[in-house]
Structure formats: structure tokens, C-alpha cells
Amino acid sequence: MTGAGRGLGRAHAIELGRHGALVVVNDLGVALDGSPGDETSGHSPAEEVVAEITAAGGCAVANHDDVADFEGARRIIDTALHEFERLDAVVNNAGVVRDRMFVNAGEDEWDTVIRVHLRGHFCVSRLAAEYWRDLAKRTGEGAGGRIVNTSSGAGLLGSVGQAAYSAAKAGIVGLTLVQAAELARYGVTANAIAPSARTRMTETVFAAAMAAPGQPGEFDAMAPGNVSPLVAWLCSTDSAGVTGRVFEIDGGRLTVMDGWQRAGTSDIGRRYGIEEIGETVTELIGRSPDPLPVYGTS
């Protein structure tokens, strides 16, 4: 469980521990933008989550490796195999943000966001997939592995001021589809979630939407823990028949996203002349549904 020291990752790790999972709680303990954290408790966020899981009767160990460093990712996988002698699921959740309007975006900011989100998903999943492939070949049976990736509404629809984040999260959807197609032969599933919840990433950008309810007993739709039962189910044997899917979840609403679908199509059976393109595009758009709006636009 990567990025498990706070927010969604913390909630997922605790939920998994509650259901008997042996959890590797990975977190670097950094600030929201990826800079060094300022923890003063003497314990890292990962260690605090481990303590919470074990206090509730679960089993967990902390790991502080960088998900986007290939050898660091290898140590994350090795931690599970050394401590628990098995690897059943990988939940990729670690991320950072460097919000900036596209025209002002810096090269280093872009690289940092893409590195942690997209490369981080690649590194950990790639090494897990290698383990499961070898296990399936050795035993002659499906490995039963589970990959749960974390995309976002920004990756599905785009989000103003978050070009790098949106691009990374869209890339994660593409990665998930390929993982599902390629790893099915080894009995491994891959799915992605696009959650909306109150975290360090969202409560500053979408403060009003993420606010906790004002009345006691009112359903807190944006509580991170609302997302975690979906993650736990996707990690379980019950989800064996579900792969290559993206699930949007916020509060009590769960949606299967339909992905890119062909809308209007025109095939004239020959090369288009340039004068025909504009007329055809106008006609196709006219009979295609309007796209959902980008986050941050009216």
C-alpha cells in the first residue's frame, strides 16, 4: 500500500488491516509537493499507521522507500515477501501535486508530478507483475495477484491548473488497461479507482466541496474511508472476474466509467480531400454527445 501515511492511503491500509490483510505501509513522509516533511512526533506517518493497525489487532510493517525509484520499489516488494512470505495485491496511491496553470508550468514541476504518479505506478506494479508471472509459471496456476491503481477525475476529464497531474492520472488509466490485458494470462487483475475525498491534495483546491458536514450524525461524503471498501474488495478473491475497469467513487456513489467510446464516424472509402474535412467534422460533432466539462470550467 503506497502513499499510506495519510489521507486515502491511510484509510485504505487501515481497512485492509481490518479485513485481515498483512499490510506493507509505504510512505516517504514528505510534504504535499514532495519536499521533505516536518514531522515532529518522532514517528513517521507510515509508522503511525502501522501502530494503528496493530493496535486494532492487525498486522503491518512500515516501509519508507521511494516508489518511483526502481530499486526502492524492489525493496517495497521484498519487504512484503520477507515479512509475510507472500504478495497478493499492490495498491498504488502515492502522489504529489505541483499545481500551476499550463502556461506557467515549470519543467521540474512537470517531471516531479509525472515521476511520482506515473513512474511510481510503473515501478511497483512492474516488479509485482514479475513476481506473479514467475509464480504462475512455477506452479502452473494463476497467481491471483491484484493491482489497484489510483487515477482521478482530473485524469478522466482534465482539471484547470493541474496539467501535469491530469496527464499523469490519464496515463495511469492507459497503464491499467494494458496491465489488465497482459497479466490476465497469469491470473492477475488490474483496475483503477478515481476517488473524490478530503485529503491534503483536495481540501485546499476544493475547500468548499471537501468540507466536513456541519451537523452531528450527517453523512460525511468526502471522508477518505468511504473509498476504502472498494479498494479492499478489488484486492480480494471476490473480484477475480473484474479487470481493466475504472471506478469513480465519492461518498456513497459508485460509478463504472465507460472510457473512450467512438461517437460519430464517417467512412467514405477513400482519402479525404482537405475541403471535405471541415464539413465532415462539423457533421460528426453535431451528432455526437457533448463531452463532460473539464474540472474548473463552467
Give the residues covered by each predicted segment.
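The beta1-alpha1 cofactor-binding region of Rossmann-like NAD(H)/NADP(H)-dependent oxidoreductases
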Residues: 43-47, 64-75, 107
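C-terminal helical subdomain
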Residues: 192, 213-298
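Canonical Rossmann dinucleotide-binding motif of NAD(H)/NADP(H)-dependent dehydrogenases/reductases
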Residues: 1-25
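A glycine-rich helix->loop->beta "capping" turn
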Residues: 56-59, 71, 78-92, 98, ...
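Residue(s) in the substrate-gating loop at a strand-loop-helix junction
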Residues: 152
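Substrate-binding pocket helix/loop in short-chain dehydrogenase/reductase
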Residues: 101-102, 109-114
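Active-site helix of classical SDR
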Residues: 125, 168, 176
